[in-house]
Design a protein with these regions (language model features):
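Substrate-binding/access-modulating region of protease and related hydrolase catalytic domains
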Residues: 64, 68, 89-195, 201-206, ...
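Single conserved hydrophobic/aromatic residue that forms the stacking wall/gate
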Residues: 300-310
């Protein structure tokens, strides 16, 4: 849904952005004014959040915990020094990812378009930032795309396969398992990617005692549908679970009464009081840990996505 990176805990993190479905947003006038039919693909577009989902998710991985008055709170992400490449693959109000069947689906299907843009820009030297911020290292994807009914995806749908392509290109992918609970209906597209790290959610029962932690009741259990390759191990998804229950969120503009990005509002005065649950919030926590692993490994070697997945 985009990110309101004006939030004090996210300020200064934006490096580049892209919006493949700009024409379907509440801020469409700003998108149109950005030029090129609202599909500005040079990384200069900064997608705002009209839903709260994107801002909450990036807070779990990257928030510094800074409040609007400059004080330090305890609500920081797992990698508070990480930066943001903001690619909005759904509408800013939460619909989608959007498939425009009135035009060529291959070109305009927003999730495919956005992920392909990430792959194409994995080594891009973004203007105006330090060389250490060039390229794209991690995709944190808190969204499902195709139905899990009838056993779900076997990992050969187009969305799972493009995430495999991202992993093979050198980008680590952390993707939500979904919130379909313990019923064994498999996993939807994206969460069924062969190579990506699929993330379930845990529930700590609101205690500090780790012995009572459980898989959250809503978290999809898997496995994904058998792809017929005679290797049952690659159907065992999700690979990991992380805290996703009753999570305190960085608040986007939309959480403030009357605030609208399209009307000039922003999240610069917001804090961290909203709460939410879902594998969406578990996933960016894992993404932040992956960022820390990459940072640590770079002191000695260049880690591959498969090494990190292990």
């Amino acid at each position: 849904t985009g990110v309101d990176n004006e939030h004090p805990g996210l300020s200064g993190k934006f490096v580049a952005g892209y919006d493949p479905v700009c024409y379907m947003h509440t801020d469409v006038p700003r998108c149109i004014l950005a030029g090129a039919g609202a599909r500005q693909d040079d990384g200069s577009f900064d997608p705002d959040d009209g839903n709260q989902h994107g801002t909450a998710c990036i807070g779990m991985s990257s928030a510094t915990g800074i409040e609007a008055d400059g004080s330090q709170s305890e609500f920081y992400g797992s990698a508070p020094d990480s930066s943001l490449i903001d690619v909005r693959i759904g509408t800013d109000v939460g619909a989608g990812p959007f498939e425009n069947y009135l035009v060529e689906q291959e070109a305009y299907e927003s999730a495919m378009n956005g992920i392909q843009w990430i792959i194409d820009n994995k080594d891009t030297a973004w203007p105006g930032v330090d060389e250490s911020l060039h390229g794209i290292d991690i995709i944190s994807l808190s969204w499902g795309i195709t139905s899990h009914e009838g056993g779900g995806s076997d990992g050969t749908d187009m969305h799972s396969m493009i995430l495999d392509e991202a992993m093979l290109s050198g980008i680590v992918v952390s993707v939500a398992a979904g919130n379909d609970g313990p019923d064994n209906d498999g996993l939807s597209g994206m969460g069924s990617s062969d190579l990506s790290i699929t993330v379930g959610a845990s529930d700590d029962g609101n205690t500090i005692d780790r012995s009572d932690d459980t898989v959250a009741s809503y978290s999809s259990r898997g496995p994904r549908r058998d792809n017929g390759d005679n290797n049952p191990l690659n159907e065992l998804k999700p690979e990991i679970s992380a805290p996703g229950t009753n999570i305190i969120q960085a608040e986007g503009c939309v959480t403030s009464g009357g605030c609208s990005n399209s009307a000039g509002g922003d999240a610069s005065g917001n804090t961290y009081t909203s709460r939410g649950s879902g594998t969406s919030y578990a996933t960016p926590s894992v993404s932040g840990i992956l960022a820390l692993m990459i940072e640590a490994c770079l002191l000695y070697t260049s880690p591959s996505p498969r090494d990190l997945r292990r």
